[in-house]
A protein has these predicted regions:
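Active-site entrance/lid segments in N-terminal catalytic domains of soluble metabolic enzymes
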Residues: 1-163
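Glycine-rich phosphate-binding active-site loops on the catalytic face of alpha/beta enzymes
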Residues: 20-21, 36-47, 134-146, 170-205
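Conserved active-site-proximal phosphate/metal-binding subdomains
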Residues: 151-165, 171-311
Length: 311
């Protein structure tokens, strides 16, 4: 099995999650320079800002980087063309089927890596020509599915022949080693990078993550079919309470409209949407992204070596 770094040309078999309103060109470049595949998150951007972020990333790194496109975005068609025009080499996708773009991307030499939350979707996408698939468990922050990473990854590995990347609930070497044991060729991480020095989220957001305990995340929108994992705060608790009471979509929208931007840019930890995975309780300090990635890989490698010695 080829490791992800061999497929992507990176130092480590690690992808930085393309988090909307967070994964800027500068942040993606910092992650790429530190050994991961940095991703620009097109969610929260428009055509002009995406193009600007791609160009800024190019100016800051000579390492591989990519773009994450949420296919439900109203400008997804335009984004699909921009990555071709700007010479992006890797595209990850979520919230939809990338099928109509794949031939265009493949002709441009772009590696296409969808994010899936179920093995059946991975199996459906494989014949379309994808290069790999990210199997993301419900432990992750932001939009989530129902299956845990532990259950999802091996079933996706068994369902498809393309390389599988594990995501959701990965913040240290023990979890990285577990991902490889499940059959993954690499991992995608997001929450653990939110507390990097280079991450552009507000300091209040980082402080909230550092205070978090193991049970301090909650999933909003599960009843309405749009589940999102966030830190518990006034907004998320009230949202869940209203949702359980039968509030309609319009009533609930008043809690979430603009809430991610309030958290990321204004540091509003009361009514902002503090998207974070269940590993938030494992975060203890703000560090350079290079230190986080170096330790993640080295501790994972040592863990795998130790496990090998046990057998």
């Amino acid at each position: 099995m080829k490791l992800l770094n061999e497929i992507l040309g990176t130092k480590y078999p690690i992808i930085q999650g393309g988090m909307a309103n967070i994964a800027t060109g500068e942040f993606a470049a910092a992650c790429s320079n530190a050994g991961a595949l940095g991703l620009i998150g097109a969610g929260g951007m428009n055509v002009e800002t995406l193009r600007e972020n791609i160009r800024r990333c190019k100016a800051l790194t000579d390492k591989p980087f990519g773009v994450n496109i949420m296919l439900m975005h109203p400008q997804a068609d335009e984004f699909a063309k921009i990555v071709v025009e700007e010479g992006v080499k890797v595209v990850t996708t979520g919230a939809g089927n990338p099928g109509k773009y794949i031939s265009m991307w493949k002709e441009a030499g772009i590696k296409v890596i969808p994010v899936v939350a179920a093995a059946v979707l991975a199996k459906h996408l494989e014949p379309l020509g994808i290069d790999a698939v990210i199997a993301e468990g419900t432990e992750s922050g932001g939009h989530v599915g129902e299956m845990t990473t532990m259950a999802l990854v091996p079933q996706v590995v068994d369902a498809v022949d393309v390389p599988v990347i594990a995501a959701g609930g990965i913040a240290d070497g023990r979890q990285l080693a577990a991902a490889f044991a499940l059959g993954a060729c690499g991992v995608q991480v997001g929450t653990c990078l939110l507390v990097s020095e280079e991450c552009p989220v507000h300091e209040n957001y980082k402080a909230a993550l550092l205070r978090a305990k193991d049970s301090d995340t909650i999933v909003t929108g599960r009843i309405g079919g749009t589940p999102v994992r966030v830190l518990k705060n006034r907004m998320s608790r009230e949202y869940v309470r209203q949702e359980k009471a039968g509030a309609d979509k319009m009533e609930l929208e008043k809690y979430t409209l603009g809430s991610l931007r309030r958290a990321v840019f204004e540091g509003d930890t009361a009514t902002g949407s503090l998207m974070a995975g269940q590993v938030a309780g494992m975060l203890h300090e703000v560090r350079p992204v290079a230190d986080i990635l170096d330790e993640l890989w080295e501790s994972g490698r040592q863990r795998m070596k130790s496990l090998g010695e046990l057998c």
